[in-house]
């Protein structure tokens, strides 16, 4: 469940697939996950895509990947070692495809994968090649952030890429 191509505006990087996504074969497939609603409301898509339409995201200049391929019930089941090796693999992918921005969905996952302590939300000082690195809140239903808070964070990235 990866959608990568050269010259994308942004690649959204989740932590790992949930069991619903693994079973259905679509990223962010769990009904409680707000990814599709948030990327639409933030301006990345003209219409709200359903998880099964995930490949259409590339038509908007957006891609999808994950730090860890192993599906779990909750992202908290992913080990630190998996995140570290996932971070290394992600760097290689980003250097190969060079999107304008990489948006890692989760501050703790970003910190673990890239060894960054006290990461802030938003644009990071680091880049991967010429790619800007952003940290955005995870859209999982387990995240306490409101839909409005999520949309505002993603909209900041959308506006920065215009």
UniProtKB/Swiss-Prot annotation:
Q: Which GO terms describe its molecular function?
A: DNA binding; pyrimidine-specific mismatch base pair DNA N-glycosylase activity; uracil DNA N-glycosylase activity
- Recorded superkingdom: Bacteria
Name the UniProt key words of this record, in alphabetical order.
Answer: Cytoplasm, DNA damage, DNA excision, DNA repair, DNA-binding, Hydrolase
The cross-references to InterPro entries, in alphabetical order and at most eight, read: MUG/TDG, MUG_bact, Uracil-DNA_glycosylase-like, Uracil-DNA_glycosylase-like_sf
Output the Gene Ontology cellular-component terms.
cytoplasm
What EC number(s) has UniProt assigned to this enzyme?
3.2.2.28
From the record, give the cysteines joined by S-S bonds. none
Q: Which reaction does it catalyse?
A: Specifically hydrolyzes mismatched double-stranded DNA and polynucleotides, releasing free uracil
Principal localisation? cytoplasm
What the entry lists under CDD domains is as follows: UDG-F2_TDG_MUG
Query: Which Gene Ontology BP annotations are present?
Result: base-excision repair, AP site formation
Q: Where in the cell is it found?
A: Cytoplasm
What HAMAP family does UniProt report for this protein, alphabetically? MUG
- Quaternary state and interactors: Binds DNA as a monomer.
Function (record text): Excises ethenocytosine and uracil, which can arise by alkylation or deamination of cytosine, respectively, from the corresponding mispairs with guanine in ds-DNA. It is capable of hydrolyzing the carbon-nitrogen bond between the sugar-phosphate backbone of the DNA and the mispaired base. The complementary strand guanine functions in substrate recognition. Required for DNA damage lesion repair in stationary-phase cells.
Entry similarity comment: Belongs to the uracil-DNA glycosylase (UDG) superfamily. TDG/mug family.
Q: What is this protein called?
A: G/U mismatch-specific DNA glycosylase
What organism is this sequence from? Answer: Serratia proteamaculans (strain 568)
- In the record, what lineage is assigned to the organism producing the protein? Bacteria, Pseudomonadati, Pseudomonadota, Gammaproteobacteria, Enterobacterales
């Amino acid at each position: 469940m990866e959608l990568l191509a050269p010259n994308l505006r942004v690649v959204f990087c989740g932590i790992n697939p949930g069991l619903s996504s693994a079973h259905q074969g679509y990223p962010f497939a769990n009904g409680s996950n707000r990814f599709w609603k948030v990327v639409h409301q933030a301006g990345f898509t003209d219409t709200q895509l359903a998880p099964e339409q995930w490949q259409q995201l590339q038509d908007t200049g957006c891609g999808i990947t994950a730090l860890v391929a192993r599906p779990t019930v909750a992202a908290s089941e992913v080990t630190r070692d998996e995140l570290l090796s996932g971070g290394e693999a992600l760097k290689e992918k980003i250097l190969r495809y060079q999107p304008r921005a990489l948006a890692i969905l989760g501050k703790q996952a970003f910190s673990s994968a890239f060894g960054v302590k006290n990461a802030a939300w938003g644009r990071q000082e680091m880049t991967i090649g010429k790619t800007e690195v952003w940290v955005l809140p995870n859209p999982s239903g387990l995240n306490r952030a409101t839909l409005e808070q999520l949309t505002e964070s993603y909209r900041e990235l959308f506006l920065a890429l215009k």
